[in-house]
From Swiss-Prot:
Keyword Ribonucleoprotein: yes
Function: Protein S19 forms a complex with S13 that binds strongly to the 16S ribosomal RNA.
Name of this chain's protein: Small ribosomal subunit protein uS19
Alphabetic keyword roster: Ribonucleoprotein, Ribosomal protein, RNA-binding, rRNA-binding
Organism: Archaeoglobus fulgidus (strain ATCC 49558 / DSM 4304 / JCM 9628 / NBRC 100126 / VC-16)
Pfam hit, one: Ribosomal_S19
GO MF term set: rRNA binding; structural constituent of ribosome
């Protein structure tokens, strides 16, 4: 008996039951009702000058550099490239539909993962006997 292989197709993106096209046509106030409380409050209070400037640049060019790590990812930003500052450099972030409702800073990590290796020469008395490479 031959086994049938399943074809796995990528599912269409939906955010709380709405497709990306529906979200892009939706007014900002209506979109805010779908977002979590913190992001909803941020949109309700309005955007800062830098955030407005970022949105204008994205509409015009499609890419922008920014320090606005608090900016909420909106449906109109999907497909654009944003360079977000992480404290040292600008990290390239390509906006995908799954990022809607999150903050830009979540995708530009400020701390680097540091993997410490074994003890070095002269670390402690007990590490003298650890064979060196």
């Amino acid at each position: 008996m031959a086994l049938k292989s399943k074809v796995i197709r990528p599912r269409d993106f939906k955010y709380r039951g709405y497709t990306l096209e529906e979200l892009q046509k939706m007014p900002l106030e209506e979109l805010a009702k779908l977002l979590p409380a913190r992001e909803r409050r941020k949109i309700k209070r309005g955007f800062t000058e830098q955030e407005e400037k970022l949105l204008r640049k994205l509409r015009k060019k499609g890419t922008a550099r920014t320090h606005c790590r608090d900016m909420v990812v909106l449906p109109e930003m999907v497909g654009k490239v944003v360079f977000v500052h992480n404290g040292k450099e600008f990290v390239r972030v390509e906006i995908k539909p799954e990022m809607i409702g999150h903050r830009l800073g979540e995708f530009a990590l400020t701390r680097r993962f540091e993997k410490h290796s074994g003890p070095g020469v002269g670390a402690t008395r007990s590490s003298k006997y650890v064979p060196l490479k």
